[in-house]
């Protein structure tokens, strides 16, 4: 019987199919061999246009940003940042961009995966310096995408979605809302991963590899921020007018302004706690234990109070069920979904997806009883989450009282924040958080 073998993946066996003749089989194999031999070189990678921001700009300016204008934007971005295989970065002392990234690190992180690994302890030759290792594509691209827009091939299957670097917003950092992270913040995220998500720890990478990835993330973020501004410039062009690609505009104004925001950041000050900080298996004195319990009670009162107002999102039982209808800033880039009329939501969702967006999902507050802290489990990490809020998320920054202000002034003190930290740390060990354990320990007397 004339047949061709078809591979059935789920059973890992060959199934005869009567649909093709022997001549068809030979032709098929010949075509496959020709494709394999002629397609040895992988297609060149390219940065994707931010179509969502293009549409947002068109809505804001009331004009169409056509292909010609977008080509000018693409040309300007290539001049400033190069390509995924050959990145560049203008290091201009007048623009303040000279020390933003190290070019050698960009080259090391960029390009296809080569299998070449540089020894951090050795002086690299010129040939080695010009050879990338493809670190970003090896470790990051399948989730975050070539462009760093959080739309890699696995992104749609992950919850939460991978971070989009191109907006310049990063959740877990030591800096206030509205400011970029420090390089140390990015390194820490790489080293420890993000608990409860698909973001793994890269603690086994060498220091030079970590440094290269940190700089490459900064590079992708900077490119995305400049792209947004250039798209806005393109929207204002008259018919036949050219985009301003002068050094003054591209390097000094666009690139320099965005870099300055990153260069000026510093971690928020941390007030030393005046109370013991909750931890299990600590050898507390009786006085310290009483002080800690008092701190936890104060933190609980603040949690339910009108100033901190934690319960409105995290819920009255801290299960993260206070609200379930909001979205993060990345999802709301085109539309403010909570305010989209029900009869328009399907049409607008289709439009958003057609532009490359991922299916909108609600952002849920953290279940504090799990003891799973995405931004880190050190006391300082929780302190920063309460003090600074979480960038790109509905979690607000604390309203701090001016130093020396009296009780009539509304706001939190740094001591209040430490009390909230103690309350949060105590929750996973509360009896409500461990019903199974409590059931075994305190068995009911059955009739």
Residue ranges with predicted function:
Residues 136-142, 147, 198, 209, ...:
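Short pre-active-site segment immediately N-terminal to redox-active cysteine/selenocysteine motifs
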Residues 22-31:
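Sec-dependent N-terminal signal peptides
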Residues 58-135, 249-306, 319-320, 409-412, ...:
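Electrostatic cytochrome c docking/interface patches
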Residues 41-44:
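Bacterial signal peptide processing site
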Residues 125-145, 291-316, 323-338, 420:
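Sequence/structural segment immediately N-terminal to covalent heme-attachment motifs in c-type
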Residues 37-39:
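C-terminal motif of bacterial Sec signal peptides marking the signal peptidase cleavage site
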């Amino acid at each position: 019987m004339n047949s061709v073998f078809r591979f059935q993946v789920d059973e890992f066996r060959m199934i005869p199919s009567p649909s093709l003749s022997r001549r068809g089989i030979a032709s098929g194999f010949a075509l496959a061999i020709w494709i394999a031999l002629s397609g040895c070189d992988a297609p060149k990678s390219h940065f994707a246009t931010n179509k969502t921001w293009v549409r947002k700009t068109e809505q804001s300016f009331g004009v169409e940003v056509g292909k010609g204008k977008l080509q000018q934007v693409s040309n300007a971005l290539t001049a400033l940042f190069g390509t995924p295989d050959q990145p560049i970065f203008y290091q201009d002392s007048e623009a303040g961009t000279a020390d933003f990234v190290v070019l050698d690190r960009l080259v090391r992180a960029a390009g296809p995966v080569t299998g070449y690994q540089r020894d951090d302890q050795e002086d690299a030759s010129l040939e080695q310096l010009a050879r990338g290792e493809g670190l970003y594509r090896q470790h990051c691209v399948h989730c975050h995408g070539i462009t760093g827009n959080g739309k890699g091939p696995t992104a749609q299957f992950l919850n939460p979605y991978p971070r989009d670097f191109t907006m310049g917003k990063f959740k877990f950092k030591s800096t206030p809302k509205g400011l970029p992270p420090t390089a140390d913040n990015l390194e820490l995220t790489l080293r420890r991963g993000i608990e409860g998500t698909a973001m793994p720890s890269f603690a086994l990478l060498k220091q030079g590899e970590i440094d290269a990835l940190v700089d490459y993330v900064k590079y992708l973020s900077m490119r995305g921020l400049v792209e947004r501004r250039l798209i806005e410039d393109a929207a204002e062009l008259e018919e036949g007018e050219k985009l301003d690609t002068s050094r003054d505009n591209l390097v000094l104004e666009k690139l320099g302004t965005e870099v300055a925001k990153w260069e000026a950041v510093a971690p928020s000050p941390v007030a030393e706690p005046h109370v013991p900080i909750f931890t299990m298996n600590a050898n507390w004195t009786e006085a310290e234990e009483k002080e800690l319990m008092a701190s936890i009670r104060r933190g609980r009162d603040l949690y339910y109070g009108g100033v901190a107002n934690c319960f409105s999102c995290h819920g009255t039982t801290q299960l993260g069920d206070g609200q379930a209808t909001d979205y993060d800033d990345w999802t709301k880039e085109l539309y403010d979904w909570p305010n989209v009329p029900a009869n328009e939501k399907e049409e607008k969702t289709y439009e958003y997806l057609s532009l490359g967006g991922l299916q909108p999902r609600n952002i849920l507050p953290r279940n504090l009883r799990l003891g799973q802290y995405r931004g880190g489990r050190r006391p300082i990490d929780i302190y920063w989450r309460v003090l600074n809020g979480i960038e790109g998320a509905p979690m607000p920054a604390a309203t701090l009282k001016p130093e020396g202000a009296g009780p009539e002034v509304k706001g939190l003190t740094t001591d209040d924040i430490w009390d909230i930290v103690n309350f949060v740390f105590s929750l996973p060990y509360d009896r409500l958080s461990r019903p199974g354990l409590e059931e075994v320990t305190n068995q009911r007397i059955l009739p």
